[in-house]
């Protein structure tokens, strides 16, 4: 168990100064270097006279300088706001408007003109590192102080900045490094692929730094180039893979992504979107002895609140994989519309309470009041997810409440439709989306389909292909759930965080 993230990092800087903490395409940085660089930058930040505990925006990608900057800010008592350098300009501006940062540290080239906020660019940061200024940690982030603020991808209005405190982070980290479901290896060698602006990144950097391991970063330029991606992955000595299931699906396109090529890759941790039986089965075939962990949780509850190691029995018997056993320190309940707890087996909204729950959204009391509340004397959060609990304490996912529609009198879970579409022998991936009429009622269901390789060659027309898919699914899908229109694509759009962009497709359909 750790009690202070900075003290833990400092401990490893003293006891294993020459051990690698960060490796980005062979450029290696040690724990000793991380201490020297973050000390020097923390001293410089202190000299700027910023408002105490004010948030600082950090802009960039997967560079080592990002990690060193985060550590420096934590030492100097400031929360950091990670913003990915591939973000849309409107999003960056919206985050600036909401967050009102006291400083911008730009590891990538900052794309906006800013008059009223000082900026440190990467050349200045590098020069500060070279100064090697000693630093005594006296006012680091602690307790309920904000450790980081991550902005969600809000589809309407301004994005919301989720405030995660040092206590929140400790609740998550100590659970992950001690939980038998994860079984994190000693001194883990972890893949660092999800961008720092996505809280899934905390699932790789927090346990790695807490246990003195090494992060192996994958820059976006590599991730976006299939040839480079597969060549790079095959050379990385990572034990632990942390990503969305969608990114794993991308990796599975390479026949070399298997235990023979990557014998040291023994752990897969998934969060951020639903892990399907189909993806888990493919992974089990490629990595028969690997530990595949399905985790679940909203950003507002610090990365994840439940996790389970997927068994062969689950892969054989479950239509939908369980999302885990919940954290001991975080009471998790399923409630009805009146807020009453439901018995095991009954479906309702999942709520989480306890020390992992955020204090709310930065500078947004209205949205905070809508989502955060007190439940049985504890801070709690409405997840907006449907679920149920088994008698064995396993949490089952039932879909998003906002992805639940009413069509021809039937209540339909869009995720259920998508899950069934993905079971067709012809389908590689699929998503169901509703089209609304001018009265905002569902007019029909559409399916976006990516076909398996070679399938299109077997059919002259899309109509014949659609008939074949419907025939394939007739025994597992009710007629009222079957989409009336099938749209065939080479790929499905992803959000900047690597999830399938369902809401973007819904917007496209309903222009």
UniProtKB/Swiss-Prot annotation:
Its main location: cytoplasm. Catalyzes the first step in the D-alanylation of lipoteichoic acid (LTA), the activation of D-alanine and its transfer onto the D-alanyl carrier protein (Dcp) DltC. In an ATP-dependent two-step reaction, forms a high energy D-alanyl-AMP intermediate, followed by transfer of the D-alanyl residue as a thiol ester to the phosphopantheinyl prosthetic group of the Dcp. D-alanylation of LTA plays an important role in modulating the properties of the cell wall in Gram-positive bacteria, influencing the net charge of the cell wall. Its EC number is 6.2.1.54. ATP binds at residues 152-153, 294-299, 385, 397-400, 499. GO terms for cellular component: cytoplasm. It comes from Streptococcus agalactiae serotype III (strain NEM316). It comes from the Bacteria. Belongs to the ATP-dependent AMP-binding enzyme family. DltA subfamily. CDD domains: DltA. The gene is dltA. It is an enzyme of class 6 (ligase). Keywords: ATP-binding, Cytoplasm, Ligase, Nucleotide-binding. It is found in: Cytoplasm. Pathway: Cell wall biogenesis; lipoteichoic acid biosynthesis. Disulfide bonds: none annotated. Coiled coil: none annotated. It catalyses: holo-[D-alanyl-carrier protein] + D-alanine + ATP = D-alanyl-[D-alanyl-carrier protein] + AMP + diphosphate. PROSITE patterns: AMP_BINDING (PS00455). InterPro entries: AA_adenyl_dom, AMP-bd_C, AMP-bd_C_sf, AMP-binding_CS, AMP-dep_synth/lig_dom, ANL_N_sf, DltA, DltA-like. GO terms for molecular function: ATP binding; D-alanine [D-alanyl carrier protein] ligase activity. It holds the Pfam family AMP-binding. This is D-alanine--D-alanyl carrier protein ligase. GO terms for biological process: lipoteichoic acid biosynthetic process. D-alanine binds at residues 199, 303, 499. NCBIfam families: AA-adenyl-dom, D-ala-DACP-lig, PRK04813.1.
